[in-house]
């Protein structure tokens, strides 16, 4: 029978290591301004082009969300996105933990009805980033307790990008969630340059604006403008 390791020093060392990883991830996620989520159905130039332009503009996190391609096609495209993001942006994959494992992505983003965070963490390990979609403070608190590194809160405003998003919960809900948890809050849903100020002013660490960016003829320009608005509100300077 295999003996259990009961060495208290080793246990303390592991706990310290896990805490350091958590602190590092929290720091990285708090520094993010604009969060790109891909959408091949809305994109004018294609997913790879969108990622390249957005990262070049200063985007520091990319979530690859693809619902229409085969697993093989997703793996190939994800591998290319990873190359673009390497050393410049955090690379996450929506839902598909299997694809994330194959390409060694930085983590995943999952929904309320997907695999439990605890299970995803066992599969991915302590060093990977796991984000969870939430709709209110109660879900956000539970996400933090379960080990999520950040929450994606929405839909903040009414949106046509995701048909099952429901009615917008309003920017005031961000403040409620921000006050309830310590991990990073990413706002998503119906956000554009006209309403994004209220999103950041209410406490979001970063935001997602899908159609406002990927439907554009100039993804780089749109990304940079979002980053500049966010940094102006946060007081952290320009992307230029």
UniProtKB/Swiss-Prot annotation:
The gene is thiE. Its EC number is 2.5.1.3. Pfam families: TMP-TENI. Coiled coil: none annotated. Pathway: Cofactor biosynthesis; thiamine diphosphate biosynthesis; thiamine phosphate from 4-amino-2-methyl-5-diphosphomethylpyrimidine and 4-methyl-5-(2-phosphoethyl)-thiazole: step 1/1. The lineage of its organism: Archaea, Methanobacteriati, Methanobacteriota, Stenosarchaea group, Methanomicrobia. NCBIfam families: thiE. 4-amino-2-methyl-5-(diphosphooxymethyl)pyrimidine binds at residues 63-67, 94, 133, 162. Binds 1 Mg(2+) ion per subunit. One of its GO terms (molecular function) is magnesium ion binding. Keywords: Magnesium, Metal-binding, Thiamine biosynthesis, Transferase. This is Thiamine-phosphate synthase.
């Amino acid at each position: 029978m295999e003996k259990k390791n009961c060495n208290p020093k080793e246990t303390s060392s592991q706990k310290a290591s896990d805490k350091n990883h958590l602190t590092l991830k929290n720091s990285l996620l708090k520094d993010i301004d604009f969060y790109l989520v891909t959408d091949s159905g809305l994109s004018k130039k294609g997913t790879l082009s969108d990622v390249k332009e957005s990262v070049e503009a200063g985007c520091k996190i990319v979530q690859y969300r693809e619902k229409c391609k085969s697993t093989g096609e997703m793996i190939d495209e994800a591998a290319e996105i990873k190359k673009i993001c390497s050393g410049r942006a955090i690379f996450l994959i929506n839902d598909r933990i299997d694809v994330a494992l194959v390409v060694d992505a930085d983590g995943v983003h999952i929904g309320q009805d997907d695999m439990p965070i605890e299970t995803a963490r066992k599969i991915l390990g302590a060093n990977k980033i796991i984000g969870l979609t939430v709709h209110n403070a109660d879900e956000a608190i539970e996400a933090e307790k379960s080990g999520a590194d950040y929450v994606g809160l929405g839909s903040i405003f009414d949106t046509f990008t995701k048909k099952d998003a429901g009615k917008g919960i309003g920017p005031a809900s961000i403040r409620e969630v921000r006050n309830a948890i310590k991990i990073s809050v990413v706002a998503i849903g119906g956000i554009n340059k006209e309403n994004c100020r209220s999103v950041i002013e209410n406490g979001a660490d970063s935001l997602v604006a899908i159609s406002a960016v990927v439907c554009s003829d100039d993804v780089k320009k749109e990304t940079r403008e979002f980053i500049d608005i966010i940094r102006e509100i946060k007081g952290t300077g320009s992307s230029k």
